[in-house]
């Protein structure tokens, strides 16, 4: 857990106290190797922080999987289509190996953003990065 906290706080420049506040509102989930977290064509607006393991996002082209990104310990993962636009996901997100993640539903996370300037700034930075990536 300490490694995850250190990596997360370094990567996202969030004070440890604020991360602990966020984690206290999240649920711990366990996923098996190859297990789907988000399926293409389904709506999922949850926000995840990986405690352990590796996830990947991919889409299918003519029956072939094309990977978009990988996320590991201390990183975030979510369907930007589901979270940002409440649309169905254009990608699949799966657990590459046994993994543990903390998850929170969009309404609960937005409530936290409204209650903490540090968490609000964290959220703004994340979604600004996504906006730049989709331009």
Please identify what each model-predicted range represents:
Residues 1-135:
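Cytosolic regulatory regions built on CNB/CRP/Popeye-like sensor folds
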């Amino acid at each position: 857990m300490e490694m995850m906290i250190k990596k997360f706080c370094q990567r996202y420049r969030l004070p440890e106290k604020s991360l602990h506040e966020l984690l206290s509102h999240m649920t711990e989930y366990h996923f098996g190797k190859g297990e789907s977290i988000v399926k293409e064509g389904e709506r999922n607006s949850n926000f995840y922080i990986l405690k352990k393991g590796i996830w990947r996002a991919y889409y299918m082209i003519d029956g072939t999987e094309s990977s978009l990104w990988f996320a590991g310990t201390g990183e975030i993962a979510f369907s930007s289509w589901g979270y940002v636009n409440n649309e169905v996901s254009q990608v699949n997100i799966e657990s590459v190996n046994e993994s543990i993640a903390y998850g929170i539903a969009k309404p609960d996370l937005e409530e936290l953003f409204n209650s903490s300037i540090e968490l609000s700034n964290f959220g703004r930075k994340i979604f600004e990065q996504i906006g730049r990536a989709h331009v």
